[in-house]
Swiss-Prot record:
It comes from Drosophila melanogaster (Fruit fly). One of its GO terms (cellular component) is endoplasmic reticulum membrane. Transmembrane segments: none annotated. This is Probable cytochrome P450 305a1. It is an enzyme of class 1 (oxidoreductase).
Amino acid sequence: MSALIFLCAILIGFVIYSLISSARRPKNFPPGPRFVPWLGNTLQFRKEASAVGGQHILFERWAKDFRSDLVGLKLGREYVVVALGHEMVKEVQLQEVFEGRPDNFFLRLRTMGTRKGITCTDGQLWYEHRHFAMKQMRNVGYGRSQMEHHIELEAEELLGQLERTEEQPIEPVTWLAQSVLNVLWCLIAGKRIARQEDGTLRRLLDLMNRRSKLFDICGGLLAQFPWLRHVAPDRTGYNLIQQLNTELYGFFMDTIEEHRRQLAKDPSPAESDLIYAYLQEMKDRSAGGESSTFNETQLVMTILDFFIAGSQTTSNTINLALMVLAMRPDVQEKLFSQVTASVAAASTDAFPHLSRREAFDYMDAFIMEVQRFFHITPITGPRRALWATKLGGYDIPKNATILISLRSVHLDKEHWKDPLEFRPERFIDSAGKCFKDEYFMPFGMGRRRCLGDALARACIFSFLVRIVQHFSVVLPAGESPSMVLLPGITLTPKPYKVQFVKRT
């Protein structure tokens, strides 16, 4: 009996200690809401984020409440620090100590149960594969003339599609996404997917869109309490995520196997792409007998990372730009006047590639303002402190998750004066030239800068110039698009319709 009493006392003592320690704030940790034993701020965070319209808004409210550009909280057992404001955001993005990625259930679920790819890895694996992937993507034209050629073909295809609508109201987002995805697919797989081809393109887009809506930047309840997948796999979205992961993996593997068969027939294909280059690297390393991290799963995750980085945010930005054009005819006509003049000054067959953007200052400024105003990636991908360090005078524990609020920089009232006003002129100087403001950072900064920035900037610019040049974007009678975006890892506009009226 005494032994039983002793064991009960030990158990009770452990529970009390666990309750106290789980609610204790680390010494000199950034200010934030009080921790609830065992749960941290998880339930409070989810409830308040839903009430105010998103976690990015909640972080800014907490920063104001606690009068700090660093907010410290605890989600489950994970310490989280949110960096807000230009100074803190810039410092986090440029310091090596914050280049890590968290290793948690949420991020492994995003990468199909692995810790592979580029975006969600760190250390030597991240450095080696980012370097290889970016080098090979440049070799096949990423950010160069070959990519411009693919953009030109897709832009002309898109114009034809819009003309065939015969000015009927349409939701443009799917058509835009198909065009952007095809440019990326040409670089990755060496071919485009025809829009009429057995629904493959639409199916892939649907998979990507459905998958992105199942995540938020903190991973939802599954990130803090992974065991919930065993209790409520449907309600937590776990089963659906697994289904979508399986379908995406199958789609990518089919393409990889097709490339493998082609390589077996011709070891030196005339047209290269990322998949060919990767398979060749796998073969070379295997022949050399060296231990290698180059494998099929890593290739699949790399493809997925480029898709996420380069396709959805790009098409959503163009979609938002078209919505603004329809809502602001004054801005649209000013853009049309400059586009017409700039195109007339060039040769008649000169396509408006990004390399010519200096002739389109107002368009360049307009695009920047769309990115600043809507900030579709309000919180960038989570970082991890690689070692214990200091930030803003506070102690940051090793392995703490760091979230970066780009929205707080893009809507900084002290800097922008009128951040809630849509005004492209803020990016035009006294000489009438477009300039980049230091507070403008839609793709992030440093070595963790977005993988898809070159594709995004080129597609957004060229597609918009061509659309404005050939069409008036008009709201149908009774249509009133919402400026409030839908939440997710990236923010997206609510469905809306516009008419594309051919200019004469």
